[in-house]
Every structure is written in structure tokens, then in C-alpha cells.
Amino acid sequence: MSVRKLKPITPGQRFRVVNGYDAITTDKPEKSLLAPIKKSGGRNSQGKMTMRYKGGGHKKRYRVIDFKRDKQGIPATVASIEYDPNRTAFIALLNYQDGEKRYIIAQNGLQVDQNVVSSNEAATPEIGNAMPLANIPLGTVISCIELRPGQGAVMARSAGAFAQLLAREGKYATIKLPSGEIRRVLALCMATIGAVSNSDHQLMIGGKAGRSRWLGIRPRTRPVAMNPVDHPMGGGEGRASGGHPRSRKGLPAKGFKTRSRTKASNKYIVERRKTRKKK
């Protein structure tokens, strides 16, 4: 994978860094795995705005992704690596031996014509293979992890993300998540071998406001520029600092822990994620 820094022939391209898309093998998606997406503009079923700064954006079609990897024991061949406008990671089209086609999240290093398999039994821990945590060797880099058996992958799915299997004890496996959190999950949960593709996504620079509009992101108003009725940090004479950083609902921002101390799943967290150091 690579990135491209554009020549500064316009102000919008001066600082722009785009993906080289070297890993992409086709620009035509599988039509049978496409579904329509209706834009909401941040409004609910009553037409009321429930999420600010959303609206517009390029028209897209959803790619139906197989997060469960429940087609057990049937080998599949990687037909193509494709771009997905709905996520940061690339996706891979699999052709199963029984004729079915499915999309999965592509792992880093997954190649066209490579064979992958999903199995509840012990399988070869190669990139792209999916199996329960109980059958994965300790220390393996994994991604697309289930939180509950049969739920489908919910953790480590974005571009470049990966977790690591640290230990197994009884019916639980201990994994280190991308956030740094160390957590126990049931060993029956499925995971995929390898890190998620498109690890260079973090190097992308939009270069201009228009790219955010292409993505459906509208301009964000600074809280200190609002009135007191609209935000706790609004108001004041002239250019006020806004006081202590607060959210729109008045909760402290920048480092305040919002997770409930009595949440039932706290017992599965061995070590909480590290807070980022202020620069």
C-alpha cells in the first residue's frame, strides 16, 4: 500500500494526501451484494434533527458484508479486493466452492486467488481464515472479533486495526484491543487471522473542506461561538474562552470518564484503555 501527495497546483491540493489504492483489483462491485442506502440527514422518523452536522454527501450503495463468517468448512477463493465507500477498510469478494459469493473485511496481505476458510474446528492460522478464539494460537494478531458467539464481528473492524490474543483460561480468552484495553471474551467467539487492510488510512489528509462535504459531513460550529442557550461554553463578552471544556449536555470533556461504574460488563475488563497524553 502507498499514499500519493498531490502537486500544489490548486489551494485544495496543496496539502492533500490520498490513498494510492495499489491493493484494489477492480472498480466494479458484485451487483448481487449491493443494497440501497437512504440518507437521513441526521433526522429521525419524525423529521427532527437528532445528530448535527450530517447531510449531503456522494450517493452510495451498501455492500452486504459477511461479519458472521458462518459458512463453515467450505473453502473460498478471493476473487477481488475492492474499495468500499461505507468504511475505511477494503473488502474482499469470496467465491465459495458451492457457488455462493460473499464480501468480507479484507485483511492486510490478503491476495487475489488466495484460499480462505471459516471453521469451528482447528484450521491453519493463515491470513483471512476465521475460527473461534479457542483454536487460535496465543500471540496471534487478529481482527473482526465477536463479542458474543454468533453475533458477528463488532471489534477491530476499521482500517489498520488489530487485536492480539494474550491468554486462555477456562471458557474465556483474553485479548488486547486496538484501544489498549485488555478484555476477556468467550473463547467460542469467532475472529479472523491478520490485521485489517488499508493501514495507511491514518495518513490521509483531505486538503479542503469540500472533501468533508463529499463524505456527508457538514461544517461544525465552535461551542464558544454559540449563545449560552445553545451550549454551556457559549456567550460572554468578546472572544471568551468558554470556561472549562463541556459537552453540549454539560458533561466535562477531554478526559472525563463516562462509563458507568456499575455496568455489568465491567467484570470482563482486565485493564482499561490508556488515556492519551496531552501534547
From Swiss-Prot:
Subunit structure: Part of the 50S ribosomal subunit. Forms a bridge to the 30S subunit in the 70S ribosome.
Keywords, alphabetical: Ribonucleoprotein, Ribosomal protein, RNA-binding, rRNA-binding
Similarity comment: Belongs to the universal ribosomal protein uL2 family.
Start-end of Basic residues biased regions: 245-264
Organism: Christiangramia forsetii (strain DSM 17595 / CGMCC 1.15422 / KT0803)
Start and end residues of each stretch annotated as Disordered: 223-279
Biological-process GO terms, alphabetical: cytoplasmic translation
Any GO MF annotation of the entry: structural constituent of ribosome
Purpose of the protein: One of the primary rRNA binding proteins. Required for association of the 30S and 50S subunits to form the 70S ribosome, for tRNA binding and peptide bond formation. It has been suggested to have peptidyltransferase activity; this is somewhat controversial. Makes several contacts with the 16S rRNA in the 70S ribosome.
Protein name: Large ribosomal subunit protein uL2
Database matches in SMART domains: Ribosomal_L2, Ribosomal_L2_C
